[in-house]
């Protein structure tokens, strides 16, 4: 098992990135003594003018990415991923995706198709760089390593809870509506005492079927699924049904043309008792300033600071203001 060594500090940093109109990326780091010792990426997006993913990677002087998860092939989770593949993925990179059936490929963009061609040809072409490809579904362990120091060991794991295997099986003979989101991967990150739920674009049909055993307690952070849409609104109900306390933090990215996130969905997280809800931009378009927003949250695994979880809002990112009753 791979080991990361530290002396004085061990932190998990999570950057949820969104743009003015659409797009979602998550860059996370395990930092040992202030240095990014492990880098992960969940989805990618860029505009013609801006690439906040590369900005974050370059700031941390990242030369290679250890873990990539492409949750599903919609463009707002895909654009720029080919560039990441070429520049940052190596033989040691674990690249995770969902196993799209051939009949569905024509539903997606040319960039998505090109990525699938690269993935499927990676072990047959001598010209393509080699890396570890994993097709994720529910209850699949994607990564496991140890952070070692100060006479203690802290396990880091990445575990998928979606897509649901039964739903994917049904799709072979069932409805072909909303193809992409049924394939969406959902992940848990675990490090030390912290549990982080990255819910991709997982929607209600999948949320209802998440196995109780796939949810490890407590959940400290949720990336709200599908940009806070009604079609993915059941997650707080699912968690409350398991008598789970609300997380300290929930975060959502924007999909402005569809007016996402929806206020009534965010209200469900408020009513559940979330400590704070952050958005990567303001739904009032005139208030945007730089075109992207980053919700940067740092978890102090050694609990050395006054606050073990700290969040910094970068660019257009904002705190969601709860609507007052009456």
Q: Where do the model's predicted regions map?
A:
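Core dinuclear metal-dependent hydrolase active-site scaffold
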Residues: 1-64, 130-221, 293-326
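Active-site-proximal beta-strand/loop segments in catalytic clefts of secreted hydrolases
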Residues: 17, 42-45, 70-73, 98-100, ...
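Active-site environment of divalent metal-dependent phosphoester hydrolases
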Residues: 22, 48, 73-79, 102-104, ...
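Active-site metal-binding motif and surrounding structural segment of the metallo-beta-lactamase
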Residues: 37-38, 47-97, 212-230, 243-248
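Short, aromatic/basic amphipathic alpha-helical patches
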Residues: 53-56, 107-126, 261-273
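Active-site neighborhood of divalent metal-dependent phosphoester/pyrophosphate hydrolases
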Residues: 67-78, 92-120, 251-255
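Metal-dependent catalytic neighborhoods of phosphoester/phosphodiester hydrolases
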Residues: 78-90, 105-115, 234-238, 263-264
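C-terminal regions of proteins
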Residues: 236-240, 244-245, 253-326
